[in-house]
Design a protein with these regions (language model features):
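Alpha/beta-hydrolase superfamily serine-hydrolase fold, recognizing
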Residues: 1-146
């Protein structure tokens, strides 16, 4: 999401110390997203230092570490989000969908029912499942309309 948001938010790109791609991003497909990397949980305890660096580099990007920051959300193209009740990161996807909704952004959320085979990123890890094919077909349709 950061790379896509940087196309429309120069301050974000500057804080990250990168030049945004000129390749236009019309929509995003986000499957079982690890959106929140600074929470006090298994992800947030170790990941931030690898993602954001230390010292001045970290300080410049600090305000953008949470993807539901309004400057990031409002800079995103339409988003198609996929999760499931068995996805260990379902709560991240639902929180991100809530932020998109609160900021009036166009998105579609597909949250699959509780089913042991529909685990984290099931549509990537097991693309031959009926639900995986359904996910990909709906995502393509969403992209075509973006």
């Amino acid at each position: 999401i950061y790379a896509a948001a940087m196309q429309n938010c120069g301050a974000l790109a500057e804080a990250a110390g990168v030049t945004p791609t000129i390749l236009p991003v019309r929509a995003l497909g986000l499957i079982s997203g690890m959106f929140y990397t600074t929470k006090f949980d298994q992800i947030g305890l170790f990941l931030p230092r690898y993602l954001y660096g230390k010292g001045e580099r970290r300080k410049a990007f600090k305000r953008y570490e949470k993807p539901d920051c309004p400057e990031i959300i409002k800079a995103l193209p339409p988003c198609y989000l996929v999760t499931s009740k068995e996805d260990m990161l379902e709560h991240y996807t639902l929180q991100f969908a809530k932020a998109l909704k609160e900021n009036g952004m166009r998105f579609q959320l597909k949250d699959f029912r509780k089913d042991k085979k529909l685990t984290h990123a099931f549509s990537v890890f097991d693309p031959y499942l009926k639900e995986s094919r359904e996910t990909m077909n709906q995502m393509v349709h969403f992209f075509e309309k973006a």
